[in-house]
From Swiss-Prot:
Pfam families: Topoisom_bac, Toprim, Zn_ribbon_GRF, Zn_ribbon_Top1. This is DNA topoisomerase 3-alpha. It comes from the Eukaryota. Coiled coil: none annotated. Zn(2+) 1 binds at residues 813, 815, 838, 843. It is an enzyme of class 5 (isomerase). It comes from Homo sapiens. Residues 35-179 form the Toprim domain. High expression is found in testis, heart, skeletal muscle and pancreas. The keyword Mitochondrion applies. Residues 953-964 have a biased composition (Basic and acidic residues). It is linked to Microcephaly, growth restriction, and increased sister chromatid exchange 2: An autosomal recessive disorder characterized by intrauterine growth restriction, poor postnatal growth with short stature and microcephaly, and increased sister chromatid exchange on cell studies. Changing residue 362 to F: Decreased DNA decatenation.
Length: 1001
């Protein structure tokens, strides 16, 4: 199922400011509710929540997806005894993508992607989950969203809401808000249901759409171009771009270039040591260092000449080592990388698993402040049984309880990461990460380490030197937190004013060192500082630049940019656009926050950001050679390209608006070289106008038809095959196919298809006329002198008159060529019968040889009947049936049409074999006709209406096709014996068949 993004809204939802419901309101809202559908973000979460709410008495059954089970249990919800049906999705249920015609890389110029329509659809691997939700929704009266309470979780919740409300629009929707899967948390969530927050979901929609547009446009631009320029190196390489990827890569490149540009400098310093009976003490120069050798040498010589040291000051003061702050996501990623050597992606994967198992709180949080209503004492008590840290947990309780060190950040959604349940059954990295979270939590709730710092300052030849010592008095949190180190450094006792002879006074040289390459923790810190990504996406962006080979890792796990990464950053920087800098993306992240807060409109942010990146893209394409030059430094000289068009598909130029969906129709080329107009809404809209195969060249002219609506409808330049047009007509001319010129439509034999082909659906030839006329007639009047304009009017005036019957025995097909005479060889009632067919197979012309010959004037009148009627569908408004003249006023002599109304009788006025022949048709206006047609002179039982005989897929009628399958009566029999009327197999009434039965509509 496809969901247009622009229409994705739930108007019944109240504003998030009023999202809390009173208990009385909830009891009223849920009155009469018997079954409640609950949907979590993952199966493990659904199982855990259901187990806690049901006290372990849930009933499990299978869903349509084998990975997402269904858990049922009885529950008392707001005064109602209800059955809770708990199931899950697997992350995002829907995905963003361009409409089908833009998905292939060669389908359009990448610039189009900034404006191309985007849709939300359900990926194939999630269809079973979607069907499960639809099936369960039909049995339920309310829906409760149990997805994670962050931006992504809120958006996933709205995807679930969209799917469920499509099945049951009046479904009540509620939101459960929780931060951990514990009995208290989930029951509290059930007792305080709120409504989903549309604004938070909107922010995610904006971010997803921008990431798709920007990423797809730049990725296609880079990949298509650089693969052509450097085929030997990049032929198989996907060169992706992302507005978070590139700033992340930029940090790595910037540090690497800083190291490359670093010039070491020699410095000099004076070092003093004193060999005391209690140990060797090193005194540091208060000047630290000097870069001037002579100056340092002079001071050193003064110290050597008078080396006696005088103690000028002895200070002693308390020193504390702070315990860690409450743990948020970014700190978890950084500390796990530094202390445990687990990368950020793996850290978050393990943390998610521990969360769904109920061992820790929600791991994606920006909060480092414990809320006052969170019972920390209970959480500390849970850890007392452990032999490793249980005694420390007990000591916290004995000293008056936990006193956490809080930070200053809160996302108002989740508390800091903390353990929620004790376990000793974990293994490997899961056990290591769980232990780290527990120890961090206990350390945070403990006390700072305490010590006494002593500072001794001495004077030698008026130069000052300092030594520091430390005595730890209370380790406190250090006893449970081995990831921090704080050691004693003993200083001997010195008295102020005392003198001593230093053991050594020496001048030592050193050299400044460059900064180190970034570690993952360093990179995450930079991303957070500059607002690149969120705590939930940092790891993903880092993994992407590694997977694309933009960066690699050194043996000590530091990031080193690759040649491709360096070339891309340098190339864009040389264009004047610092796309590797964080400013553009940081601005977007700030806007997304404002959308969540209701301070900015999502559409305004979307429009501004698209235009900003689109302008950058246009100029980047114009300066693309700078990108080539930057990469050539690493890959060697590449292939020269003459023009941009050698790489990117041309921008499709719209000819007119589609009469079905109002999207642009563009000129395209068929595989065999022919031309047609295709709707940009394909495949949802399959409208197309097929030009005949005799058209050798077709292109859009700059002129616009002044008549056809809606404006603009561009004219076409056409060049025809020699001999395909009457001799009096030019082979090249400019014309309008917007529907204003009936004669031109007949000359071009325009064919229009409005839907997907079916096996039983014949291909008609005048549906172009049907659609074009509808557009033409319904939107502007057609004065008699304006129907033919410009060159098409001149063409119409030079048309030869129709050939009189008997002047030639040749039969002409719809292409204007002489048809070929063939004989039926297949076994059956028509074996041996001869028929005419298109010689080239280009058109669908077909005519039995023993049928009346229409002559060279064109194909038989029946061949002009519309496609829709062959399936029982009424022709569209404005349809002109070829060969039919003006409507007559006669009644149908008792014959009824498909509307069960009396038909009218009309007469064929157009020259041809059927001129003067009468027929019955629907009496309603052309726009409302049911499609009924019957010749008056056909032998039909009085008072009955025959089934319509619309053209089949090869020019013969369905009625004659049905007759050909039965034994054929002799001509005398057919002339003297009335046919038995056929009956419908559905209602058993004569006059029509099942496809045309009113009961089958």
């Amino acid at each position: 199922m496809i969901f247009p993004v622009a229409r994705y809204a739930l108007r019944w939802l109240r504003r998030p400011e009023d999202r809390a419901f009173s208990r009385a309101a909830m009891e009223m809202a849920l009155r009469g509710v018997r079954k409640v559908l609950c949907v979590a973000e993952k199966n493990d979460a659904a199982k855990g929540i259901a187990d806690l709410l049901s006290n372990g008495r849930m009933r499990r059954r299978e869903g349509l997806s084998k990975f997402n089970k269904i858990y049922e249990f009885d529950y008392h919800l707001y005064g109602q005894n209800v059955t809770m049906v708990m199931t899950s999705v697997s992350g995002h249920l829907l995905a963003h993508d361009f409409q089908m015609q833009f998905r292939k890389w060669q389908s359009c110029n990448p610039l189009v992607l900034f404006e191309a329509e985007i849709e939300k659809y359900c990926p194939e691997n999630f269809v079973d989950i979607k069907k499960t939700l639809e099936r369960e929704t039909r049995q339920c009266q309310a829906l409760v969203i149990w997805t994670d309470c962050d931006r992504e979780g809120e958006n996933i919740g709205f995807e679930i809401i969209h799917v469920c409300k499509a099945v049951k629009p009046n479904l009540q929707v509620l939101r459960a808000r929780f931060s951990e899967i514990t009995p208290h948390a989930v029951r509290t969530a059930c007792e305080n249901l709120t409504e989903p927050d549309q604004r938070v979901s909107d922010a995610v929609d904006v971010r997803q759409e921008l990431d798709l547009r920007i990423g797809a446009a730049f990725t296609r631009f880079q990949t298509l171009r650089l693969q052509r320029i450097f085929p030997e190196v990049l032929a198989e390489q996907l060169i992706s771009y992302g507005s978070c990827q590139f700033p992340t890569l930029g940090f790595v490149v910037e540090r690497f270039k800083a190291i490359q540009a670093f010039v070491p400098e020699i410095f000099h310093r004076i070092k003093v040591t004193h060999d005391h009976k209690d140990g060797i003490v090193e005194f540091n120069w208060k000047r630290h260092r000097l870069f001037n050798h002579t100056a340092c040498l002079v001071l050193y010589q003064l110290c050597v000449e008078d080396p006696m040291a005088t103690v000028v000051e002895v200070r002693s003061k308390p020193k504390s080592k702070w315990r860690p702050q409450a743990l948020d996501t970014v700190e978890l990623e950084k500390l796990a990388s530094r202390k445990l050597r687990i990368n950020a992606k793996e850290t978050m994967r393990i943390a998610e698993k521990l969360y769904t198992q109920g061992y820790i709180s929600y791991p994606r949080t920006e909060t480092n402040i414990f809320p006052r209503d969170l019972n920390l004492t209970v959480l500390v008590e849970q850890q007392t049984p452990d032999p490793r840290w249980g005694a420390f947990a007990q000591s916290i309780l004995e000293r008056g309880g936990p006193t956490p060190r809080n930070g200053n950040k809160s996302d108002q959604a989740h508390p800091p990461i903390h353990p929620t349940k004790y376990t000793n059954n974990l293994q490997g990295d899961e056990q290591r990460l769980y232990e780290f979270i527990v120890r961090h939590f206990l350390a945070c709730c403990s006390q700072d380490a305490q010590g006494q710092e002593t500072t001794v300052e001495i004077d030698i030849a008026q130069e000052r030197f300092v030594a520091h010592g430390l005595m730890i008095l209370a380790r406190n949190y250090l006893d449970v937190y081995p990831y921090d180190h704080w050691s004693d450094k003993i200083l001997p006792v010195y008295e102020q004013g005392s003198h001593f002879q230093p053991s050594t006074v020496e001048m030592v040289d050193g050299e400044t060192s460059p900064p180190k390459l970034l570690t993952e923790a360093d990179l995450i810190a930079l991303m957070e500082k500059h607002g690149i990504g969120t705590d939930a996406t940092h790891a993903e962006h880092i993994e992407t630049i590694k997977a694309r080979m933009y960066v690699g890792l050194t043996p000590d796990k530091r990031f080193l940019p690759g040649h491709l990464g360096m070339g891309l950053v340098e190339g864009y920087d040389s264009m004047g656009y610092e796309m590797s800098k964080p400013d553009l993306r940081a601005e977007l992240e700030a806007d997304l926050k404002l959308i969540c807060d209701g301070k900015k409109d999502k559409f305004v942010v979307l429009r501004q950001q698209v235009q900003k990146y689109k302008q950058v893209f246009i100029e980047a394409v114009a300066k693309a050679k700078k990108l080539d030059e930057a990469l050539a430094q690493y890959f060697g000289n590449g292939t020269e390209l003459a023009q941009q068009e050698d790489i990117y598909p041309a921008m499709p130029e719209p000819i007119r608006k589609c009469p079905q969906c109002n999207k642009d129709m563009v000129l395209k080329t068929k595989k065999n070289g022919g031309f047609y107009l295709s709707c940009m809404g394909f495949p949802e809209c399959r409208s197309a106008v097929w030009l005949p195969d005799s058209v050798l060249e077709a292109s859009r002219d700059s002129s616009v038809c002044p008549v056809c609506q809606p404006h603009p409808v561009y004219r076409l330049k056409l060049k025809f095959k020699r001999g395909s047009l009457p001799p009096t007509m030019p082979l090249e001319f400019v014309c309008c196919i917007g529907g204003c010129d009936d004669t031109l439509r007949e000359i071009l034999d325009l064919r229009f298809s409005g839907g997907p082909p079916r096996a039983s659906q014949p291909s008609g030839r005048l549906q172009a006329n049907q659609s074009l006329n509808r557009m033409d007639n319904s939107q502007h009047p057609q004065p008699a002198d304006s129907r033919q304009t410009g060159s098409s009017k001149a063409l119409a005036q030079t048309l030869p008159p129709p050939t009189a019957a008997g002047e030639s025995n040749s039969v002409t097909c719809n292409c204007g060529q002489e048809a070929v005479l063939l004989t039926v060889r297949k076994e059956g009632p028509n074996r041996g019968r001869q028929f005419f067919k298109c010689n080239g197979g280009s058109c669908n012309f077909f005519l039995w040889a023993d049928s009346p010959n229409p002559g060279a004037g064109g194909p038989p009148a029946l061949a002009y009947r519309p496609l829709g009627a062959s399936l029982g569908c009424p022709p569209g408004p404005g349809i002109h049936l070829g060969g039919f003249g003006n409507p007559g006023d006669g009644s149908g002599s008792g014959t009824s049409c498909l509307c069960s109304q009396p038909s009218v009788t009309r007469t064929v006025q157009k020259d041809g074999p059927n001129k003067g022949r009468q027929f019955h048709t629907c009496a309603k206006p052309r726009e409302q006709q049911c499609g009924f047609f019957q010749w008056v002179d056909e032998n039909t039982a009085p008072g009955t209406s025959g089934a319509p005989s619309w053209t089949g897929d090869r020019g013969r009628t369905l009625e004659s096709e049905a007759r050909s399958k039965r034994p054929r009566a002799s001509s005398s029999d057919m002339g003297s014996t009335a046919k038995k009327p056929r009956k419908c197999s559905l209602c058993h009434q004569p006059g029509h068949t099942r496809p045309f039965c009113p009961q089958n509509r």
